[in-house]
């Protein structure tokens, strides 16, 4: 499921490169619920009967995952935690999302061993580095998030996979 998840996130990037891309329309979305719907619709469109797509599925501890891909061929699942990069979230909040939401809450199920933090970015912005307190841009934030995901994945051991994907909606 992890390979399929990563492929589908890459497909979103490819979609944004087409001349009939929804990039400009998606960049105008400032509500996470609406963004979740358009991304889920696109993931559903490209499913090819390999998986089903659920939105806001409630987990055993009453937490809601943003998007869940369920394999049509096995019990395996992958979860996507969506965050709008232009919202007022700090770099620390985004880093904490990996462990606090994605790993502990959404990937706790036995058959859910693949997860992604999907961060959209509609315009340039900066975040305060969580340790050094200096301002950083999207590329450095992405590096910090990937490193955090790698650490979380190592702690969980083999068979659990986490990625971070930046969906760049900037003009």
Set out the residue ranges of the language-model regions.
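Intrinsically disordered, low-complexity, repeat-rich regions
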Residues: 1-17
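Acidic-basic catalytic patches of nuclease active cores, encompassing PD-(D/E)XK
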Residues: 14-54
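Short, contiguous acidic/charged loop-to-helix segments that flank catalytic cores in large enzymes
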Residues: 23-30, 55-59, 86-96, 133-136
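Feature representing long, continuous alpha-helical segments
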Residues: 33, 37, 41, 77, ...
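Active-site metal-binding core of divalent-cation-utilizing nuclease and nuclease-like domains
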Residues: 50-74
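Conserved catalytic cores of phosphodiester-cleaving nucleases, focusing on short active-site segments
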Residues: 67-69, 78-86
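Catalytic cores of nucleic-acid endonucleases
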Residues: 84-129
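Domain-level recognition of nuclease-like catalytic cores that cleave nucleotide substrates
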Residues: 120-171
